[in-house]
A protein has these predicted regions:
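Non-catalytic accessory regions of SAM-dependent methyltransferases
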Residues: 1-107, 166-167
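Surface loops and adjacent helix of pleckstrin homology
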Residues: 44, 116, 145
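A short local loop/turn or secondary-structure capping micro-motif enriched for an aromatic residue
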Residues: 49-51, 120-123
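Short, low-complexity, polar/charged sequence segments that are solvent-exposed and flexible
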Residues: 51-52, 61-62, 110-111, 131-134, ...
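Non-catalytic substrate-recognition/targeting regions of SAM-dependent transferases
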Residues: 94-105, 121-169
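A short interface-forming secondary-structure element
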Residues: 108-121
Length: 169
């Protein structure tokens, strides 16, 4: 399925005899291999969910870190600038921008970030650092209070991650 363009791997597609899912913690990055051992990409693991892996990169040399986040944010920015005259839009659409579980809304110099899975939660500081490097924002707010987080075993919270978000934007 991954070779056909899918970005998720279901737990029933994993040979758990060869690679037991319980050996991974939620949010671990791993190299996904085909049955013959050919690397298919880097994935973020959610071993206790039906969707047990989400593709981060087809190149096994590119783990999800600040450098890859900066690159993906720049690509997303380039695409949005073609569509919008003003900087008020959804900058990151999760899997559509190859950042599964991440949504970033831009309101001029203010950014609201939603994280929906453990893989993105693990790199939350790098997400903020990448946003600061690319955009030099006034403020970044984490609005992580969706019900989907509970399904992933994540706590809900809303907090300023960088700067101070005004009451209204």
């Amino acid at each position: 399925r991954l070779r056909a363009g899918h970005l998720w791997v279901y737990s029933n597609e994993i040979d758990v005899a060869a690679t037991p899912l319980h050996g991974f913690a939620a949010g671990d990055q791993a190299i996904l291999e085909a049955a013959g051992g050919k690397p298919l990409g880097i994935v973020a693991m959610s071993p206790n969910n039906l969707i047990c892996a989400r593709l981060l990169s087809r190149d096994v040399k590119h783990v999800l870190d600040k450098s890859l986040l900066v690159h993906r944010l720049n690509v997303a920015l380039s695409l949005r600038e073609r569509l919008f005259d003003k900087p008020f839009y959804r900058l990151v659409y999760g899997e559509s921008d190859l950042l599964p579980g991440l949504v970033v809304d831009r309101f001029g110099d203010y950014f609201v970030v939603q994280i929906a899975n453990p893989g993105m939660e693990r790199v939350r500081d790098a997400i903020v650092e990448a946003l600061v490097q690319v955009f030099k924002p006034q403020a970044v707010l984490f609005k992580n209070d969706s019900g989907a987080r509970k399904l992933e075993g994540l706590d809900s919270y809303v907090e300023d991650a960088y700067g101070v978000m005004p009451e209204t934007v």
